[in-house]
Amino acid sequence: METNDLGFVASLLFVLVPTVFLIILFIQTNSKEG
């Protein structure tokens, strides 16, 4: 089975972008409270 680099990068970004967004949101919320 061939590995499609473009598909791999796309799926990686699809997982990574929301995760980073949630982490930033979480940090901002914590810094506001404390």
Curated annotation (Swiss-Prot):
It is a single-pass membrane protein. GO terms for biological process: photosynthesis, light reaction. It is found in: Cellular thylakoid membrane. Keywords: Membrane, Photosynthesis, Photosystem II, Reaction center, Thylakoid, Transmembrane, Transmembrane helix. Pfam families: PsbM (PF05151). It comes from the Bacteria. The chain crosses the membrane at residues 7-27. One of its GO terms (cellular component) is photosystem II. PSII is composed of 1 copy each of membrane proteins PsbA, PsbB, PsbC, PsbD, PsbE, PsbF, PsbH, PsbI, PsbJ, PsbK, PsbL, PsbM, PsbT, PsbX, PsbY, PsbZ, Psb30/Ycf12, peripheral proteins PsbO, CyanoQ (PsbQ), PsbU, PsbV and a large number of cofactors. It forms dimeric complexes. NCBIfam families: PS_II_psbM. One of the components of the core complex of photosystem II (PSII). PSII is a light-driven water:plastoquinone oxidoreductase that uses light energy to abstract electrons from H(2)O, generating O(2) and a proton gradient subsequently used for ATP formation. It consists of a core antenna complex that captures photons, and an electron transfer chain that converts photonic excitation into a charge separation. This subunit is found at the monomer-monomer interface. Belongs to the PsbM family. This is Photosystem II reaction center protein M. The lineage of its organism: Bacteria, Bacillati, Cyanobacteriota, Cyanophyceae, Synechococcales.
